[in-house]
Design a protein with these regions (language model features):
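N-terminal glycine-rich FAD/FM-binding segment characteristic of electron-transfer flavoproteins
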Residues: 1-149
Length: 149
């Protein structure tokens, strides 16, 4: 499907602020790429949780609900997200720079044999011209992150 997807973290039955911020950025990236914005929410007692993400322009919500899925545990969450991503094949996946996101995102990238950039401060869609090959690559994701030293 090549959509943009955001892994939404929950705390006390609510989507955490960092996930809402990522949904906002995800919506702008999805609009630039002319694709849909998806959200994945994993936890327990999630009835109506999708109502918290729809105001951010989410097109599809994937919910995995079970009493054993909250609080966060690495292996069950990684298994669920990996299987979902293999099925829907997102073009871009956004995870918060939280303890959960820093645990989950590299596991997903490893399982799917794909790239990962951490600690981005900005994400932009653009193009790159390879002058040697005389080829222009469009709709590239530029990941801006701080560089030290």
């Amino acid at each position: 499907m090549n959509n943009v997807i955001v892994d939404c973290e929950i705390e006390d039955g609510n989507i955490v602020d960092v996930s809402l911020e990522l949904l906002t950025k995800g919506r702008s990236l999805a609009d630039l790429l002319n694709v849909q914005l998806d959200a994945v929410i994993i936890g327990k007692e999630l009835k109506g949780i999708e109502q918290q993400v729809y105001p951010f322009g989410v097109d599809n919500v994937y919910v995995a609900e079970d009493s054993r899925l909250y609080p966060y545990e690495t292996l069950p969450h990684a298994s669920i997200v990996s299987k979902l991503f293999k099925e829907i094949k997102p073009e871009i996946a956004l995870f918060g720079a939280t303890s959960i996101g820093r645990d989950l995102a590299p596991r997903i990238a490893s399982a799917l044999k794909c790239g990962l950039t951490a600690d981005c401060t900005s994400l932009e869609i653009g193009e790159h011209e390879d002058k040697k090959k005389k080829k222009t690559y469009k709709d590239l994701l530029f990941q801006i992150r701080p560089a030290f030293g």
